[in-house]
A protein has these predicted regions:
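Active-site catalytic motif of lipid deacylating hydrolases and related acyltransferases
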Residues: 27, 35-153
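Sec-dependent N-terminal signal peptides
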Residues: 5-15
């Protein structure tokens, strides 16, 4: 009788071991990339060096990165500087920027800007940032190689702000055939209409920012004037539950909106108000 019990125990242990080996282990190594935009007038003469940083090197992100990282436990964060001079933006010159800011202060009624906000695309400036983003993407691939991280195990999520949007597209171009992509969070993209990509590469694509050029928009004086907001190309085709545009809530206090405040991350507290179940809320999933 004891021999039969022992045989049964050994049989079960053997089969459980084999069954355990048959269950595929998740070997995915996930990385969350933060890409900042222009760092302000004091840095206007500078251009990115395309280096990888393991911490926010300039304090650009305030509490935004901390909030996002809490929803991505165990994920490795890396940072790239997408800063470029104003001449690569839709403003083209600091004078144009100042003029737009001045006249926007008097637009308390009109919701559509024909000339006050600098909305004319700057394709050359945008492409320069894309090109530098490609260099950064190659640098990230080198980082993976140096740390013996198999590319078929890598999954990348991206968070970009302002000028960082163009830079992120360049990084995507450099890596799209080599790694997987998860979520793409686009915060107040600058020159957003210039280029898009095939968003099917991503699990989710969300664009956050000010609303403009429709009946539900705020008056011009409360809109994002640093990067007048339009949809990134193709986001309207992303499934409703997987992406789209998320606007500053219409109930958000006017004192917290404006040419600068509707763009700057220091005033992005409304982003933290997006709760589980709300459209645009995100967290680590597959």
């Amino acid at each position: 009788m004891e021999n039969k019990r022992l045989t049964l125990v050994l049989f079960l242990c053997c089969h459980l071991s084999i069954f355990g080996q048959m269950i595929p282990k998740d070997t995915t190594q996930r990385f969350l990339i933060f890409i900042n935009g222009n760092r302000g007038p004091k840095a206007n003469h500078e251009t990115t060096d395309n280096r990888l940083h393991e911490k926010d090197p300039t304090g650009y992100w305030y509490a935004i990165d901390d909030t996002i990282l809490k929803r991505f436990p165990g994920v490795k964060a890396v940072y790239f500087d997408g800063h470029h001079p104003v001449n690569t933006s839709q403003h083209r010159t600091e004078f144009n920027f100042a003029k737009s800011y001045f006249f926007s202060r008097f637009c308390w009624i009109s919701k559509r800007s024909r000339w006050v906000l600098n909305k004319r695309p700057n394709p050359e400036g945008f492409q320069l940032r894309v090109d530098h983003g490609q260099i950064a993407g190659e640098n990230l691939l080198t980082y993976f190689a140096q740390h013996n991280i198999p590319l078929n195990q890598v999954k990348i999520d991206i968070v970009c702000h302002s000028m960082g949007y163009a830079y992120s597209l360049g990084m995507f171009d450099a890596m799209k055939s080599k790694v997987q992509f998860g979520k793409f969070l686009i915060l107040s993209p600058e020159n957003a209409s210039a280029q898009g990509r095939d968003w099917n590469y991503f699990d989710e694509v969300w664009q956050y920012g000010s609303r403009a050029d429709d009946k539900q928009s705020d008056p011009i004086c409360y809109q994002d004037g640093i990067a007048p907001q339009v949809a990134v190309p193709g986001i309207e085709n992303v499934p409703f539950t997987k992406g789209g545009r998320i606007y500053i809530p219409p109930t958000w206090p006017k004192r917290k909106k404006g040419f600068i405040k509707s763009h700057h991350l220091l005033y992005y507290q409304w982003f933290h108000e997006i709760k589980p179940g709300d459209r645009g809320y995100f967290q680590l999933s597959n």
